[in-house]
Amino acid sequence: MKKIGVVGIVITQKNKEEILAMQVVLGEFSDIIVGRMGIPREGINAIALIVEGTVERISALTGKLGKFENISVKSALAVTME
C-alpha cells in the first residue's frame, strides 16, 4: 500500500563527495520522488522531498540518506493511497 509524505533533509556541512553521493541515492529513488525543493543557506542547506511509495521503499531512501555524516533526515508519512 502506498503512502504520500515528506522527507526533510538538512545538510549541516558542505562536503562535495557526500553531496554527490546523496545525488546518486536520490537518483536511485527517483521513482518515488514526486517533487523536490531546496533552500540554500550559508552554512546549512535544507531539502524537502515529496514522496509517494510503500513504507518499505521510503524507509530504504531515508535509511541510505541517514548514513551520511553531515546529513540529517526525517520523514512524515500522512496519507494512504489506494
Q: How should these model regions be labeled?
A:
Residues 1-82:
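Long, contiguous binding/interaction regions
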